[in-house]
């Protein structure tokens, strides 16, 4: 099948109009009419990931985070993005990104997180007007649990070295709001809908203040909160193209390390 068929299937699941205004989802590099030899699935595009795709003989990379996010004024070798562009073109490897459109789609990134947390009665945290889509989710655990014990379980489940949190007013929680990635913009909304705890990937230092009488706040880490997006990509492609060779990257692209 052609690369454009794969892009079409991804966009049927997560339409590009669902992406945020600042985003740049879709085909980033490549010729849509080329036959696809295989797809490497990743969170971030790096030179090492492109080399991995080349070694596998794959000519498509499907990533969550766009390589081309801000304007590129030249293609040399002075930045990581420029080097990735050159390498992808040299190796004839197409790059496709499904970012906030996949975050906002039903069944997308946040649903992947909610399923692993065992949440029920899911609803959009911040619905997009007139669409069955939105930013974040809110749901319930089957029964109230001790918040610190639950966070310790989540830390282990998501492979987190350090989970950041601020306690809320109640030791037990049941109603959970969540958003993968950088979700501090939804803290107030989580409080408005009565969440006992809001879980996201990143929260800036100052945003942890002022909510201790409303809800617990917890940050997993951006990479850790979205790492299962690769599983979602694999299911989507296998369901639509069972004969297409796919592989999850073996490279951890998280640039943050812990001592």
Give the location of each predicted region.
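Hydrophobic structural segments
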Residues: 1-259
